[in-house]
Amino acid sequence: MIMQEFEVVSRVDKDVSNRKEVLLMAIDFKEPTFIKVRAKEDVTDHTKVYSDGKKCYVGDKIIGEVLSVKNGSDVAVNTKYDIKYTGGYSLDGKTVYLDEHFPPVLKIQGKEIDIRKTIGLHHELPEKWMADEDYEYPYAHEVATGIEKKYVESLGVTWKAYCDEVDKNLRQVYSRTLEKSPPSLDLAPYLYCRDREALGEIRKSES
């Protein structure tokens, strides 16, 4: 039996017929994968849990059943559009977008870091997964940043060095006026931030 390790990122208490259950949201940062678990007992955030795709375990103990699984294996990373926040995702979650002007690979501390993976599959995708579970943008973004950080550090570079290099390019991207935006872009982050300027540019540049 192949087991995959996840970290619990959120918990929701449920009362079902006078019986308490907990919905657990957990993510594997190494190979970006999301599971939603119906658990019979609670665990704390950041608890390491394991799953075979059907059951969820803490150690050798079964704590619940997996209700849904999402992973990045069938998600496309598209770099052919202008994206005001550098990264984004389609409404259906099947495509992650990165701004075409953002370098796809950055040289950081002597290593080549693929932004399509760090920002695309290890930030934007987890953020979309959380948003689709009705978490508000700030919390979804916070969880996604944590996943991105764990992945980046696993590559052997420091989070500070990574952020310093990324931020240089983020400022350049945001200063540009959008020329072409994907028609399927999920606008939830812009709407939450009430970024009217960005929303106006996106609507004008949709192709």
Residue ranges of model-derived segments:
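Intrinsically disordered, low-structural-confidence terminal and linker regions
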Residues: 2-43, 47-58
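Metalloprotease/metallohydrolase-associated module, dominated by Zn2+-dependent proteases
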Residues: 32, 40-46, 54, 62-111, ...
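Active-site recognition of the HExxH zinc-binding catalytic motif
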Residues: 119-131
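Generic low-polarity alpha-helical segments
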Residues: 22-24, 117, 121
